[in-house]
């Protein structure tokens, strides 16, 4: 792919960097490298510090290594952050901060070959890591009625999932995005936005195991952050945001056992910085429509 054909604008870039409170000597992780927008900003603020940037998309890693200055204190790691990574298995240090930007990059969305968009008639792929075997096409043509219905209801919140799945099974094999859109146009045309939006979201989440990966990555981050380190997360739909809110609440709330004779109030692992999600400004939403659904949440490590 010629990366010059696609233009990506990082969402809430300044706000995310400000919330991280970068220390020049600190050690940081950008858990979702993407098109390097946040990575470059973090690296430019480091002096004696270092940044580890992760991405499971080999194309993103390759482009980053070509684009980034070799003098910047960065190591690019082709891996999803939740998988046993170099920093969690071989490095004996703690982190001063970690950033998760959970959105797809414009390069992934706008590249027809990746199969993420319902606006192009391309093979139903949707893999962020092209080395994995499961594609959206495989799921549509091989999953059972119950499995597909569950995916669409849980990950897409599709109201008439049964009708959609019945037609998918009837029309098998589905090969391209337009094969699927022809079905969603008939059975999902009353939902807000494009008829295929929620179906494609559900498939993408299943293909890449996005929600399970997020849960594991958040839990892993707790073990790597030093006291006063910050975790900054930018989400783009309610399913992600729900997981983040639950994680922050779970680790910032202490439930006193009923049988304890005295009230002990220990320090919780996290304190929440953003009591409500921080949203893009009106100006940013006007300049970058893909920022409209973004929510930023921040917590600080206590112990």
UniProtKB/Swiss-Prot annotation:
Keywords: Cytoplasm, Methyltransferase, rRNA processing, S-adenosyl-L-methionine, Transferase. S-adenosyl-L-methionine binds at residues 36-38, 55, 81, 101, 108. Specifically methylates the N4 position of cytidine in position 1402 (C1402) of 16S rRNA. It comes from Aster yellows witches'-broom phytoplasma (strain AYWB). Transmembrane segments: none annotated. Belongs to the methyltransferase superfamily. RsmH family. One of its GO terms (molecular function) is rRNA (cytosine-N4-)-methyltransferase activity. This is Ribosomal RNA small subunit methyltransferase H. It is an enzyme of class 2 (transferase). HAMAP family: 16SrRNA_methyltr_H (MF_01007). GO terms for cellular component: cytoplasm. PANTHER family: 12S RRNA N4-METHYLCYTIDINE METHYLTRANSFERASE (PTHR11265:SF0), S-ADENOSYL-METHYLTRANSFERASE MRAW (PTHR11265). It comes from the Bacteria. InterPro entries: RsmH, SAM-dep_MeTrfase_MraW_recog, SAM-dependent_MTases_sf.
